[in-house]
């Protein structure tokens, strides 16, 4: 694991308007979240970005990790965020978005809202159904990272994709999708028009499944899957800050 792969926290103390809990995607690490986190920090928000178990290491290490471990780490990070004493939002990319949705299903009362970037809730690729059997004869497949339109940027990911961990990811989708109706917090969704990893229809499934009264959606026309590092990154950064500002203001208005 390199220094860039490590989890990070920006604690602004009493000056912080709220706290954003950022969750990276499958086979990636917090480096894909750092520019977003730095932008939110500069906009006046605390940021906590955990490293999910098995990530930031070799694919062999990730192969031993499970979605329950990933969720447990995110939930622990939520408790860390709540301890800072400010309203807490959760934001995630791809599988990070799935985990944020699961967090909202289980602990929605502790969240002020979600910001999702190309969230994953299903895989339309037919070979995905073969993964449970495939993992015993083919432990890993080609890496899925760095789906970026920006030619000079690379995402930090494992060198290959462990099939066993992908099977666990599919299990996460299986428990999360049927309970989307439990999500009632405000949502801000950013979806790339062209994504070679997660079908953009995933965002539509999320919008249709949740029961949030406020759901705002933005299409990212110039970015592929890892949009937090791509051409439309600033749209995500500014849009999420504006969303958080609005939600915090509404909450204060209710309590004033």
Regions found by a protein language model. Give the residues of each.
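Gly/Ala-rich beta-loop-alpha elbow adjacent to hydrolase catalytic centers
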Residues: 92-96, 100
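Short beta-strand/loop motif that positions the catalytic acidic residue
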Residues: 183, 189-191, 195
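Conserved alpha/beta-hydrolase "acid-adjacent" motif
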Residues: 196-202
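Catalytic histidine neighborhood in serine/cysteine hydrolases
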Residues: 204, 208-226
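The serine-hydrolase catalytic nucleophile loop
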Residues: 27-38
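Active-site nucleophile loop of the alpha/beta-hydrolase fold
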Residues: 115-125
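Conserved alpha/beta-hydrolase
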Residues: 41-59
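Catalytic active-site module of serine/aspartate enzymes centered on a nucleophile-bearing elbow/loop
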Residues: 221-256
């Amino acid at each position: 694991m390199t220094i860039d792969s490590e989890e990070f926290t920006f604690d602004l103390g009493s000056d912080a308007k709220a706290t954003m809990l950022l969750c990276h995607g499958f086979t990636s690490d917090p480096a894909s979240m750092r520019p977003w986190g730095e932008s939110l920090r500069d906009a006046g928000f605390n940021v906590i970005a955990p490293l999910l178990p098995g990530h930031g290491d070799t694919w062999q290490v990730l192969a031993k990790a499970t979605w329950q471990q990933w969720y447990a780490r995110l939930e622990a990070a939520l408790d860390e965020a709540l301890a800072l004493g400010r309203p807490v939002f959760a934001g995630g990319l791809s599988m990070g978005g799935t985990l944020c949705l699961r967090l909202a299903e289980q602990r929605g009362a502790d969240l002020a809202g979600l910001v999702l970037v190309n969230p994953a809730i299903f895989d339309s690729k037919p070979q995905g159904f073969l993964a449970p059997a495939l993992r015993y004869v083919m432990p890993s497949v080609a890496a899925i990272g760095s789906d970026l339109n920006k030619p000079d940027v690379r995402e930090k990911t494992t060198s290959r994709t462990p099939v066993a961990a992908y099977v666990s990811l599919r299990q996460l989708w299986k428990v999360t999708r049927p309970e989307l109706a439990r999500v009632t917090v405000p949502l801000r969704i950013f979806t790339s028009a062209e994504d070679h990893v997660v079908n953009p229809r995933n965002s539509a499934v999320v919008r249709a499944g949740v029961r949030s009264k406020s759901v705002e959606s933005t299409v990212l026309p110039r970015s592929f899957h890892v949009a937090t590092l791509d051409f439309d990154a600033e749209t995500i950064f500014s849009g999420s800050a504006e969303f958080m500002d609005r939600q915090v203001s509404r909450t204060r208005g209710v309590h004033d």
